[in-house]
Amino acid sequence: MKKILIVDDEKPISDIIKFNMTKEGYEVVTAFNGREALEQFEAEQPDIIILDLMLPEIDGLEVAKTIRKTSSVPILMLSAKDSEFDKVIGLELGADDYVTKPFSNRELQARVKALLRRSQPMPVDGQEADSKPQPIQIGDLEIVPDAYVAKKYGEELDLTHREFELLYHLASHTGQVITREHLLETVWGYDYFGDVRTVDVTVRRLREKIEDTPSRPEYILTRRGVGYYMRNNA
């Protein structure tokens, strides 16, 4: 049974989410401020965190930033603010996805399922689920899918699940330009609720970790107005 940590200082909202998630078969633990969130995270080791942006004591952005120092657990951020700035900051600090309040149970369930599904290594297109995926070497970048590890110059990179999945998908289709919409559907696991800005932010975050000079990328390149691709001979 997958365990969800719900962090929201508004108890009615927390109770509704808990009820719906429990009904879907998840184990649920709750926290009502940032300090409790960090304590519950350490004690319960959840499979996914639903994290409100506005929290007392320690805000959601700081909670996400702290958790990301030691864990790549999927984080779904909730926000009453519908500003692009808050969404981008949340993603850059390590959140995997966001939902703007008010939201429907259907939307939240879809996002949680997508994050949990994508938090496990997936076979590349056409590969049998029970076969062992082979490592991919592109220049000085090595991707080991069965270990969920990426290395640069032999040193392991600190990637979140989402960043790894995006890198792995692009590396599995070197030279092929992939649209933001396709990446959103394939890597994030949904196409109806998503925002392509999420892809752009994650690509930028990934470049900062794998590129020697992120402003002049050698691995993940942009085809303006279309999408992204992994260079064949980076």
Curated annotation (Swiss-Prot):
Domain Response regulatory residue range list: 3-116
Alphabetically ordered keywords of this record: Cytoplasm, DNA-binding, Phosphoprotein, Transcription, Transcription regulation, Two-component regulatory system
GO cellular component terms, A-Z: cytosol; membrane; protein-DNA complex
GO biological process: fatty acid biosynthetic process; negative regulation of DNA-templated transcription
Segments traversing the membrane: none
Compartment(s) of residence: Cytoplasm
CDD domains (alphabetical): REC_OmpR_YycF-like, trans_reg_C
DNA-binding region location: 133-232
Post-translational modification: Phosphorylated by WalK; can also be dephosphorylated by WalK.
A GO MF term: phosphorelay response regulator activity
InterPro entries recorded: CheY-like_superfamily (IPR011006), OmpR/PhoB-type_DNA-bd (IPR001867), Resp_reg_WalR (IPR047791), Sig_transdc_resp-reg_C-effctor (IPR016032), Sig_transdc_resp-reg_receiver (IPR001789), WalR-like (IPR039420), WH-like_DNA-bd_sf (IPR036388)
Residues modified as 4-aspartylphosphate: 52
Main subcellular location: cytoplasm
PROSITE patterns in alphabetical order: OMPR_PHOB (PS51755), RESPONSE_REGULATORY (PS50110)
Pfam family, one: Trans_reg_C
Its biological purpose: Member of the two-component regulatory system WalK/WalR that regulates genes involved in cell wall metabolism. Binds to the promoter region of the transcription factor fabT gene in the fabTH-acp operon in vitro. Inhibits transcription of fabT, probably acting in an unphosphorylated form, thereby playing a role in the regulation of fatty acid biosynthesis. Essential for normal growth in vitro. Required for maintaining normal cellular morphology, acting, at least in part, by regulating peptidoglycan hydrolase pcsB.
Note in the entry: Part of a walR-walK-walJ operon.
NCBIfam families the UniProt entry points to: resp_reg_YycF
Subunit structure: Monomer. Homodimer.
Protein name, as recorded: Transcriptional regulatory protein WalR
Species per Swiss-Prot/TrEMBL record: Streptococcus pneumoniae serotype 4 (strain ATCC BAA-334 / TIGR4)
Native organism taxonomy: Bacteria, Bacillati, Bacillota, Bacilli, Lactobacillales
